[in-house]
A protein has these predicted regions:
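Cytosolic regulatory regions of ion transport systems
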Residues: 2-575, 579-602, 644, 648-654, ...
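Short, motif-level signal for alpha-helix interfacial/capping segments enriched in acidic residues
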Residues: 486-491, 624-630
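C-terminal accessory/binding modules appended to enzymatic or scaffolding proteins
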Residues: 595-605, 609-616, 635
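Amphipathic, non-membrane alpha-helical rod segments
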Residues: 629-648
Length: 714
């Protein structure tokens, strides 16, 4: 094993090893000095003189005379240990400060700054230092006694204590030269305050450096705070862009011309003031909000889709229990409601168990003022109960999946053990999930829990901080790989000739989340598709041309004023011979019946409706006898298509958009189904990630890809 001198030095100065070394060197100095002088002076008669000379040597007086070879060696050894002692004292007093000062003074450029060294911040810092050693890391924490700070420095990072809201602290961090700034204090309000302070410091420092863009990542536990974040973004760009071209230099040139023209025209009207607003990119800060609890829910349902252990093709109902309703429980519920839409059309039933269920119910409805019961386009049933009811004799009998989201992991383990002990008769075909945050060791414990000496319980850990707080997740957005590529692929199909590389970063958080949910619902659709393909044994229902024609009549045609308007370009994406086409669509149209494709499209419609409802959208009312004024109103959050599947075709007749051909909006949901294979192959060049048992992707994705590949290669 290669000796790492730098790592040893860091371990030395940031651990108790330095204190121990200082103590040992001090003791050995006294011992050998006293021994040497005692040999010269006499052990008893010269005791006081030897003690005095030992103290003098310890303080740096090396002027001594030794006639005996043993005393001479002893005194020289004492001098060596004295030097080590003083080195330890120096390192104790100044070593840490000098190392940090040297970095801040000369190397704090293009570095990563993490604000907050709590459990989440420490997990991220540790991941960066262990797996991304080319990165320079600087951490600030408000607590000077935080043990994680020393641990970060020992691993090779740099850390200081201070309040990042303070402008002086931000300047000390050289925040204006940072490559990335990640706010993970553990409290939303603190993260927002730091962000606000950063938006004041950076524009001042960067006014002469317009190309120095900053990427800020802010952890927000509550989705309500995304609205506050939007206000900060708007304030940071509060200059309304009445002059806005693609380049700042063009804006400046126009402004310069205006300042020359206006004074001449207004010389006889001195009170006629002009307000000119100019868009400058130099004031832009790229801000991305994230939640590790959303990451946890995302990994859970990508690996283990809702209803994984239920027959959702025929008559099975998915009954989900969420135990503990804090940040993790809320994120799990949000994703469950957004994704829990099945082939058989049955609503998702969710019960939240919490020891303060009435309060949590009220808080949930403040955040999501939605109906809790299935009706109209609502396709879920939600109930809140006291968590004690889960431990009744038949408490878990009706549930398929039970997800423990308590902040106290030990309490969750105890609850599971109690259920196994008292309700063993109801454990068959049940899945238990446990949120483990920083307790990675729970994985092994969960895997070892048994009903008896032979039969294990299916307990699946999720949400370990080492995974959901990693650099690849927080910064590189690795979990969004499929969503990003699906969005780019959509634009390739429908807007050929444009650039897609930076498209994702320009999307609002709402649209980014919309793409995520579309991709994350894919495993639930694929469960049905895989069963349909197996059931059909790869037999063709129709010749492709016949299937395409019937599909066009069913979903792409629209009767307007007794004339049939067909969106032929959209369905031609299934089998284009030139340019971009939807990979795999032709196979799905041939091997799955149109009735089943429509059921899958209805699933997608239910999912799309649920996502918009959860995000505060309502149905845009249609004026009687008139067309819709718009397809959607972003300000009021009203959408004309927030209706049932059966109403889509009729509503499509009254949506008229400038420059766009009339369109049967049923085809949009059908296209999402037909893009299933395309989404997968466009995101993954090979099957390695999909085959990896440790990846976040469920077996349904790889199984589906294999089936389509086999048909293609027939």
């Amino acid at each position: 094993m290669k000796f790492d001198l730098k790592r040893y030095y860091r371990s030395f100065i940031y651990s108790n090893l330095n204190d121990t070394t200082m103590l040992i060197c001090g003791i050995l100095t006294v011992f050998f000095s006293f021994l040497g002088h005692s040999i010269e002076n006499g052990f008893f008669s010269g005791f006081l003189k030897s003690a005095y000379q030992t103290l003098a040597l310890l303080l740096g007086n090396y002027d001594f005379k030794a006639t005996n070879i043993v005393s001479k060696c002893s005194l020289y050894i004492a001098i060596v240990f004295t030097l080590f002692f003083y080195c330890s004292v120096f390192i104790k007093l100044l070593g840490k400060k000098l190392r940090t000062w040297f970095f801040l003074k000369f190397f704090a450029k293009n570095h990563i700054v993490i604000c907050g060294a709590g459990d989440m911040g420490y997990a991220l810092a540790k991941d960066i230092l262990n797996k991304h050693q080319d990165k320079k890391l600087l951490v600030v924490d408000i607590n000077p006694t935080n043990d994680n700070v020393n641990s970060i420095c020992t691993l090779g990072g740099y850390a200081i204590s201070g309040n990042a809201i303070d402008k002086d602290v931000l300047n000390k961090l050289n925040i204006t030269k940072a490559e990335k700034i990640i706010l993970m204090t553990g409290k939303d309000i603190s993260n927002l305050e730091i962000l606000d302070a950063i938006t004041k410091v950076i524009p001042e420092a960067d006014k002469n450096d317009p190309d120095n863009k900053k990427n800020v990542y802010i952890h927000l536990e509550s989705k309500e705070n995304y609205e506050i974040l939007q206000s900060i973004k708007e304030k940071e760009n509060d200059k309304v862009s009445l002059i806005k071209t693609r380049k700042d230099i063009s804006n400046s040139e126009i402004l310069d011309a205006i300042t020359k023209v206006i004074p001449k025209a207004d010389k006889n009207d001195p009170d006629n003031k002009k307000n000119v607003y100019i868009h400058l990119k130099s004031s832009m800060i790229n801000i991305r909000a994230f939640s590790v609890y959303d990451n946890a829910a995302q990994t859970l349902f990508m690996k283990h889709p809702i209803g994984e252990n239920v027959d959702t093709i025929d008559n099975g109902s998915v009954n989900l229990a969420i135990v503990g309703f804090d940040a993790a429980g809320l994120s799990v519920l949000y994703r469950a409601l957004a994704l829990g839409h099945f082939f058989n059309g049955k609503p998702l039933n969710v019960t939240i168990f919490d020891n303060n269920h009435e309060k949590k119910r009220a808080e949930f409805l403040k955040l999501y003022p939605i109906s809790l019961k299935a009706s109209g386009i609502i396709n879920w049933n939600i109930d809140f109960k006291d968590d004690g009811r889960l431990f009744n004799k038949d408490g878990i009998e009706n549930f398929n999946q039970i997800i423990f989201c308590k902040t106290n992991v030990q309490a969750s383990l105890t609850d599971i053990a109690r259920i196994i002990k008292n309700q063993s008769a109801h454990l068959e075909n049940k899945q238990f999930f446990i949120f483990i945050d920083k307790h990675d060791g729970i994985k092994g414990i969960a895997n070892d829990i048994k009903i008896d000496s032979k039969n294990k319980v299916d307990i699946i850990p999720f949400g370990n901080f080492s995974q959901i707080c990693s650099y690849d997740v927080v910064v590189n957005e690795i979990y969004d790989k499929m969503a990003i590529r699906a969005d780019q692929r959509y634009n390739e199909l429908h807007n050929p000739g444009t650039k897609y590389e930076t498209k994702w970063n320009t999307l609002s958080p709402f649209l980014q989340d919309s793409n995520r949910m579309q991709v994350e619902h894919l495993p639930i659709k694929l469960k049905a598709i895989n069963k349909l393909l197996s059931k059909n044994k790869f037999l063709e229902y129709l010749e492709y041309d016949e299937a395409k024609e019937k599909a066009r009549n069913r979903w792409f045609d629209l009767m307007l004023n007794d004339q049939n308007v067909s969106d032929i370009n959209e369905i031609n994406l299934w089998d284009k011979t030139e340019g971009a086409k939807i990979e795999g669509a032709k196979i799905l149209a041939t091997y799955i019946s149109l009735d089943d494709i429509e059921k899958l499209a209805k699933m997608e419609k239910h999912r799309w409706n649920a996502f918009h409802i959860l995000n505060g959208w309502t149905t845009l009312p249609k004026p009687e006898g008139q067309n819709y004024p718009d397809r959607k109103d972003n300000n009021k959050k009203e959408h004309a298509l927030l209706i049932g599947w059966d109403e889509l075709e009729e509503a499509s007749k009254y949506i008229v958009e400038d420059g766009k051909k009339p369109h049967n909006y049923k085809s949009d949901d059908v296209e999402t189904v037909m893009r299933a294979y395309d989404m997968i192959v466009s995101a993954f060049e090979d099957d390695k990630i999909l085959q990896d048992e440790n990846s976040i992707y469920c077996k349904e994705i790889f199984e589906f890809k294999q089936k389509i590949d086999r048909i293609k290669n027939k």
